[in-house]
Amino acid sequence: MIKEVKIEEISSVMEIIADAKRLLKKQSSQWQNDYPNQKVLLDDISNQNLFGFFQDGLLIGIESLIIKEDENYKGITLGKWIKKPSQKDLVIHRIAVRNNYHNKKIGDQLIKFAIDYAKRKRIHSIKVDTHKKNIAMQKILLDNNFSFRGIIYLKREEEDNQRLAYELVI
């Protein structure tokens, strides 16, 4: 079941983030600085943007679903968005799954939830980005009919701030 994450679940959220950071460290510099940190995730929770995949009461995976124009997406290179970034985009950030639950299609279920969420909110463009070395995330996006749109550069300071940008128009 996927539902909104509550403040009482922040310790479980941070465990999932720690798992993701360890995994990503093996393949790239993604999430290796102080991001995402507890403040970012608490903001997601307080803004009702953080959703979790729960199984038998255990939080297994998370994603932030944010309806707004993302500043990082304004300067796309080597391609273009199908729909120009706007306040009516659904932007997916911070998808992560507990280590013991990889290869169980949890990421796919989170993406499918995001698509259904966008449809319920009458949003027609879903945007997301990932690191070029995050092959698993790229596969999940392509398997769910997202198309590669180009390259964006994150505004926050990070050693490797280049990201692959994907979009699904519904």
Where are each of the predicted segments found?
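A short beta-loop-alpha structural element at the N-terminal edge
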Residues: 1-15
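Conserved GNAT-fold acetyl-CoA-binding loop/helix
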Residues: 21-40
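Conserved beta-hairpin
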Residues: 49-67
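Conserved acyl-donor/pantetheine-binding loop and adjacent beta-alpha core of acyl/acetyltransferases
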Residues: 64-94, 102
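Conserved acetyl-CoA-binding loop-helix of GNAT-fold acetyltransferases
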Residues: 94-97, 103-116, 139-143
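Conserved beta-strand-loop-alpha-helix junction that forms the acyl-donor binding cleft
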Residues: 102, 128-138
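Conserved GNAT acetyl-CoA-binding A-motif
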Residues: 111, 118-130
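Conserved catalytic-core motifs of GNAT/GCN5-like acyltransferases
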Residues: 129, 142-162
